[in-house]
Amino acid sequence: MQATEANFDGLVGPTHNYAGLSFGNVASQNNEKSVANPKAAAKQGLRKMKQLADLGFHQGVLPPQERPSMRLLRELGFSGDDATVIARVARDAPELLAAASSASAMWTANAATVSPSADTNDGRVHFTPANLCSKLHRAIEHESTRRTLRTMFNDTDRFVVHEALPGTPALGDEGAANHTRFCEEYGARGVEFFVYGRSEYRRGPEPKRFPARQSFEASRAVAHRHGLADEATVYAQQNPDVIDAGVFHNDVIAVGNRNTLFCHQFAFVEPNAVYDELRAKLSGLKAAFNVIEVPDAQVSVADAVSSYLFNSQLLTRPDGKQVLVVPQECRENPRVAAYLDDLTSRTGPIDDVLVFDLRESMKNGGGPACLRLRVVLDDAERAAVTPGVWIDDTLFGRLDAWIEKHYRDRLAPADLTDPHLLAESRTALDELTQILGLGSLYDFQR
């Protein structure tokens, strides 16, 4: 059946800030305590969505989560009215207020792992929200993610939204940031590719400096849950040395689309074996496989991490050609810029490069790929999605005006103690659910 890939980008929330919460994420740590601009962050992300929609891509939006999370703070023993709780946490445990206020749900590549209906044993699209149990500020996301996905993809004849895996390090799951899918055509059966950093029960190399967040056991559990066939599933271990260099998810060192894998030379343990298995399993589906492996001599791992070359979107345009969507930092790094010029000058799967200003997200370690969740949908499935979430001229205008009305243009870490920020955020989110047609999505609306 004819199908296409839709991208659902996370709308940056009103509490976007730089608290340095993500150990192993170099940009997050380097920009700790900087002053953020939530309004600019949200508009940068929205402009990317609009430009891609204008180019003919199916582009949706996922709403922010409620922050600060008063549920978390109350579960951690703080009581009183909301203002009292915020004041107490700010005084006694400011690091918990920072975690409860994080806008990290904007990076929807970590929202869930998605398998299209062509791959699953029951012919439905499967979603497993990621437990994100390696970081407190992200481990609180999956319940809201599940509620949002079940609201947007509510036709249970076509969609299955599972619970997150149990939140233990043995099943640490970071979602689609460590998953991609290869196929000849989106609607055809494909090979799903799961990348992990460590195994709880198998011996193997592990990073020494920064933690590996994705376990093999989690990847395998998601594949089993989604009803994927063994002959169309590949597991690969991420190179622990690149994790120690700041590659905290596989989408910082590799990106795939249809029958093309674009990756760094040092992305994987035993890369040739990985490529061979992908090629063999795709061949069994009568699909080709292309690898564009970037040599370390041309783009070092450090350059890849600082520019986010691989945290890009690789998209198939309506004319069948592929385009790479990169952050502007790629043009500001002379070695990466030279590589991209060479890439598009030669004959190959990637014909063009689109550059976006995503500076506010990038300073927290999130490029174009982090901001989007890929969902392959056929025509009937796409028609079953809540209609108000698709980006077009009208929705863009309404969201742009909504951001202008509700978002601050300056947010320092000290501003998280302001009880008015919670009220501002709730007012904004209440209006947003009406714009998107999502009903009473948030706890404060129920």
UniProtKB/Swiss-Prot annotation:
Chain sites annotated for binding substrate: 19-28, 110, 137-138, 213, 251, 364
Catalytic site positions: E174, H249, C370 (nucleophile)
Catalytically driven reaction(s): N(2)-succinyl-L-arginine + 2 H2O + 2 H(+) = N(2)-succinyl-L-ornithine + 2 NH4(+) + CO2
Record keywords, A-Z: Arginine metabolism, Hydrolase
MF (Gene Ontology): N-succinylarginine dihydrolase activity
InterPro entries attached to this UniProt entry: AstB_sf, SuccinylArg_d-Hdrlase_AstB
Protein's UniProt keywords contain RNA-binding: no
Example of a GO biological process term: arginine catabolic process to glutamate
Enzyme class: hydrolase
Pathway terms, separated by semicolons: Amino-acid degradation; L-arginine degradation via AST pathway; L-glutamate and succinate from L-arginine: step 2/5
Enzyme Commission code(s) on record: 3.5.3.23
Keyword Cytoplasm appears in the UniProt entry: no
Function: Catalyzes the hydrolysis of N(2)-succinylarginine into N(2)-succinylornithine, ammonia and CO(2).
Family to which this protein belongs: Belongs to the succinylarginine dihydrolase family.
Record note on quaternary structure: Homodimer.
Protein name: N-succinylarginine dihydrolase
